[in-house]
Amino acid sequence: MDQRKPPATEEGWYALHDCRSIDWDAWREAPQRVRDRALSEGIGFLDAYEAVEDADEGQTAVYTVMGHKADIMILHLRPTMGDLDAAERHFEQTEFAAFTEQEFSYVSVTEASGYTEKSREYFEGEVDDDSGLAQYIQARLHPDVPDEEFVCFYPMSKRRQPDQNWYDTSFEERAAHIKRHGDIGRGYGSEVSQMIAGSIGFDDWEWGITLWSDDMRHIKELLTEMRFDPSTSQFAEFGPFYVGRKFDPSELPAVLAGQRVPTDDASVPETPADVAEHEHAPADAGASHSHAEEPTASGAQTGAHAGGDTDSHGGTHPGSASEGDHPHSEESSDEDDSGSSSSSGGRPDVSADFEEIDDAAQRLGRLGLHEGDAYDAGDYALVFHSSADAEDIVDDVSDLESNFDHYDRHVQTAVRADSGQTYVVSIWTAKDAAETAAGFLKDIDGVDEQLGGSLGEGVEGSETADDSDAQAAESSQSIRETLESAGVYAGQPHGEDVYALVVYSEANAETLDEEVTDLRSAFERYDTHVQTTVYGDTDGDVAAVASLWDTEDAAQTASDYLTDLPGVVGRHGEGDGFGTMGMFYTVKPEYHEDFVEKFDTVGGLLKEMDGHRETSLLFNHDDENDMFIASQWDSQKDAMAFFRSDDFSETVDWGRDVLADRPRHVFLA
């Protein structure tokens, strides 16, 4: 048999149809705080990809999916397969992804083939690039996802049976089939849009077909007519069909609430972040932005995508100021121009009535926030004192922080405690952004003293940060070498050290255990997670949550979630001193009491040592033989004096017989 002639083809954008189901049971059981964060991250992901912040060009859209096969479908079109690969894995890093399961996916590339006489002229280079035909083919290869309400996606292949083998037919016969098939499709051109993507070698079928229409009956009528065409009846095989409806990322809360979408804003369920916006952040009448509408408190775009650093395709680049400088700013109506601050509109009072100070960096240092770790030189900080207890305002501040995070000039906002006093700290890369944030922070319960100041100069600050980092690394290495010489590591390589975070909480044990159980389930999705445990003292006065990670980056990311736990009053070891040495011990059950007595003895010695602040023995709520010791010191010199002492060496030697596992020592400074 003669070799059959394949058609010429040209490829355009790569396509990924990512179909996911929602774990509805897990969603219903999740705490509201977790659901709010998941929605915020889901909206943020979809907004960023619809704005094509990740590539030079492309398209992204999201749809509900009806039936049992999936609940949502995310469609990505990008110039390279690498873009699709990154997008798929990026989604998995969001909190929202934890509530989804990928039920089906399809990888393909938009395709135009040279079966018709006109298209063959294009492939043979006989038409100008600006001709109507060339522009039509390019539009097929780089399509705009239409705004039609309904989508229908399905994969298909050409039949390869002995008496019905598409690939054994002549080029002329195939071309005749394609022409007749195309004539049917053109008859529905005003009612149905299509995207044809080839997938030979990419996926299990040979093509992926995507159809859009404002009336699903038009798609049904089109496909019904095509089924009776010989090109389909004799040669087509079809995979599963996925039918859904397009929705805006901002409507993700409505989708998860079981509401009808598209929907107007009034019917979208409110999250605490939305409530915070209504109470603290009316529209910014005085702001001037490059687009008509700005992000809402949930991070969604109510109109065009946020502008700013846009490229020729209208997409924004990561790290640009595309979402505007002012937290919660939205387009306002004419009657808002008066500056009223009612819930119906108008800009809140952001007159920057805080006192300017010169020692902002020193104040942050006393609160455990240092240049290079918490901020960069040249940033601007607000430090507001509150007479309220930290645990009473942590939720409100967390809600505002979630809103602020949608603006790229925000660094961080958090509650800090020092010597029994409560502070709200908000750091921004520019003073004008901080001034606007002040208008919202001043409404936090109990706020009285309001201070703000620059955090040094950029160039000088970077040198200081480098020196600080070098000193910290030197300190850590020195102490680790001392511990190793005492045999603490029992031969374990330094590369197996873990990074630990500890937060203190005043919440009751039952509440804290429930919250940490939910958080631990989320952390366990990551290979870098070692353990997250609740520890408490025998009197029940102190509770700590310790989270251990294989990498420092993972620990830093986890810290944001730990501070969201109820009743958090500060991160242990943050302050103006050297910090905390954290020691994790698993004791053999028969030596439990002996270990506690030994700790009491060593604790008495520590009280007499210069520079010692506090050392606490805490027990795992689930296993009393799993213990955590937190030892805080004023300086490296003070800590080294103890770790080099004979008393410490004797304690280490004694511990070899009573410990069920090797001790784990980590620095929390």
From Swiss-Prot:
Q: Where does heme bind?
A: H181
Is Heme a UniProt keyword of this protein? yes
Heme: present as a keyword of the record? yes
Q: Which residues cross the membrane?
A: none
Write out the entry's keywords from A to Z. Heme, Iron, Metal-binding
Q: Which GO terms describe its molecular function?
A: heme binding; metal ion binding; oxidoreductase activity
Q: Where is this region: Disordered?
A: 260-351, 451-477
Q: Record's InterPro entries?
A: ABM_dom, ChdC/CLD, Dimeric_a/b-barrel
Checking Pfam families in the record gives: ABM, Chlor_dismutase
PROSITE patterns, A to Z: ABM
Domain of life of the source: Archaea
Domain ABM span(s) in chain numbering: 579-667
PANTHER family hit by this protein: COPROHEME DECARBOXYLASE (PTHR36843:SF1), HEME-DEPENDENT PEROXIDASE YWFI-RELATED (PTHR36843)
Q: Which family would the database say this protein is a member of?
A: In the N-terminal section; belongs to the ChdC family.
* Protein name as annotated: Putative heme-binding protein rrnAC3100
Q: Which source organism does the UniProt entry give?
A: Haloarcula marismortui (strain ATCC 43049 / DSM 3752 / JCM 8966 / VKM B-1809) (Halobacterium marismortui)
